[in-house]
Amino acid sequence: MINISFPDGSIKQFAKNITAYEVANAISMSLAKAAMVAEINGELQDLSIVIDNDCKFRILTAKDPECLEIIRHDAAHLTAEAVKELFPETQVTIGPAIENGYYYDFARDKPFTNDDLAVIEAKMQELSQKNEQVTRELWDRDKAVEFFKSIGEHYKAEIIASIPAGEPITLYRQGNFIDLCRGPHSPSTGVVKHFKLMKVAGAYWRGDSRNEMLQRIYGTAWATKEQLDSYLLMLEEAEKRDHRKLGRELDLFHFQEEAQGMVFWHDKGWSIYNTIEQYIRKKIRKNGYTEVKTPVLVDKSLWEASGHWEKFRDDMFALETDDKTLALKPMNCPCHVQIFKQGIKSYRDLPLRMSEFGLCHRNEASGALHGLMRVRSLVQDDAHIFCAAEQITDETVSFCKLLTEVYKDFGFTDIKVKFSDRPEIRAGSNEVWDKAENALKEAVEQAGFTYTLNPGEGAFYGPKLEFVLTDAIGRQWQCGTLQMDFVLPERLDASYVAASGEKKRPVMLHRAILGSLERFIGILIEEYAGRFPLWLAPVQVAIATITSDLNDYALEVQKALIDNGVRTDFNISPDKINYKIREFSNQKIPMIAVIGKQEQENKQVAIRRLGTTDQEVLSVEQLIAVVKEENEKYL
């Protein structure tokens, strides 16, 4: 007999070699019917798994969040099965679950069309309704390679041949379809009911541009129809808010082939950029940071010493000149250490908070570039805090408070924290890691946050905090980070003189709030749907005259606004006033100052705020005061 422990603390005895499904059925027939997978000693397993030892046991159903990834993996197999039935000449490759869905890559001469997707989706519904049994099979490696070659699935044969010897080869069969997979999977295809195929894109085999191009079908799958409908509605809203679309419509920026991944900022977009930089600069000065500027192009010897050359060489832009190899910096930290090392530092100088709007370059694959969200040239709101070990908690608390203030000012109040602790391969002793992790945990709790743990996901040189924002339509964006570093000060020989007179290494805290300004602006465009708050809007007040004889007064108003730092635009053309208002509203300008004869006579303007038809009559001085008051809250 074996002892099986359940989540409620109870322990029951069962005969050896019982399956997970049989255990579920012994608990409740309804539970067995709803069961998708079992968690055995913390690992998800198929219901068909045989249990022959004592274990901790839990049954998972579609209601459990862990099962969403299972459903999506099931849906990927269902997609492949449907494609093979409809287009038997197509070869299947890989199909993992990803955030919000899954994809499956296919090798096929003829590209899939949108009409094909509709047919494939209908076939998937048919296969789901058949409720085909899904079974796990353990195969001999050579037999599996020969089998897939014999049915023309050469990509699968290649994958199996690359699996290290001794690892089990598991295949999953459903109906006439069989696929290589580690699993686990649901017991039948009927579990996958709520799905939709989204699009087709190109993808290189094994992600290598030297390999053949495959066709990637993206899909989404959910546990309930309500979840699917909600997600599709969110996507519809996200499409309206797409920063690339709004960037064109609002004349903020553009990209072009001659400079892939590099932003061409137009005057309005650059205004937003500079306003954010001005805002952050004010915040960090108030919080005791110095601001520096370091070179963009640095000899590779520094990157070799820091370890970046070995780790990130393929992602760096390098050039040869005067028998030297120079690289555009992908990050700022080694350069900040060079500033720290200028002159002797004492414990009295710590903590030293060094910030930079650092221009960095990363050689992202062209296929990974995505508007402002993924670029090759980026500016980080980067800072490094050089401190003693006993200052880590206080510095982290201060950073968390600063970060919270910044996010709140931009309208983000739902902030989640992820804590990544020690990986298996790491620098430093367990004692050092214990102190570091405890310092971060204590700081997060003092700052009023709760956190979720990412076990083993810290960098080899220290634990990490990630700060995740939730936007207006429920999407999550990881922006802020605080990364502890024991290694770089050692590698680059940074030190300070302790109170005892001995030389010590500072701890280095890498931290950012926005991440990159480019990406954060992309997030803001989508968060606000282009309707920037008054203090951040590239044009704060637009002036529109009702008749042309009011133009001289309109120009007087514009000059007064500009002289007082108000960003303005105007339209004194002969066009009708309703047309002018509509055009300025389409540009999402927060305030429109309408000027008629009465406004001219009284030295006033009629203010219409974006999204309303109400008008408020103000003197020019009052209008200036309203805008200045808003600006001064942030700038």
From Swiss-Prot:
Cofactor-binding details, from the entry: Binds 1 zinc ion per subunit.
Pfam families: HGTP_anticodon, TGS, tRNA-synt_2b, tRNA_SAD
Family: Belongs to the class-II aminoacyl-tRNA synthetase family.
CDD domains named in the record: TGS_ThrRS, ThrRS_anticodon, ThrRS_core
UniProt-annotated stretches for the region Catalytic: 242-533
GO MF term list: ATP binding; metal ion binding; threonine-tRNA ligase activity; tRNA binding
NCBIfam families: thrS
Gene: thrS
Record's subcellular location: Cytoplasm
Catalytic reactions on record: tRNA(Thr) + L-threonine + ATP = L-threonyl-tRNA(Thr) + AMP + diphosphate + H(+)
Organism from which the protein derives: Rickettsia rickettsii (strain Sheila Smith)
Enzyme class name: ligase
Positions annotated to bind Zn(2+): 333, 384, 510
Subunit text: Homodimer.
PROSITE patterns: AA_TRNA_LIGASE_II (PS50862), TGS (PS51880)
Any single GO CC term annotated in Swiss-Prot or TrEMBL for this entry: cytoplasm
UniProt keyword Nucleus present: no
Protein name: Threonine--tRNA ligase
Keywords linked to the UniProt accession: Aminoacyl-tRNA synthetase, ATP-binding, Cytoplasm, Ligase, Metal-binding, Nucleotide-binding, Protein biosynthesis, RNA-binding, tRNA-binding, Zinc
Residue span(s) of domain TGS: 1-61
Cofactor: Zn(2+)
E.C. numbers: 6.1.1.3
Function statement: Catalyzes the attachment of threonine to tRNA(Thr) in a two-step reaction: L-threonine is first activated by ATP to form Thr-AMP and then transferred to the acceptor end of tRNA(Thr). Also edits incorrectly charged L-seryl-tRNA(Thr).
SUPFAM superfamilies per record: Class II aaRS ABD-related (SSF52954), Class II aaRS and biotin synthetases (SSF55681), TGS-like (SSF81271), ThrRS/AlaRS common domain (SSF55186)
Any one biological process term the GO annotation gives: threonyl-tRNA aminoacylation
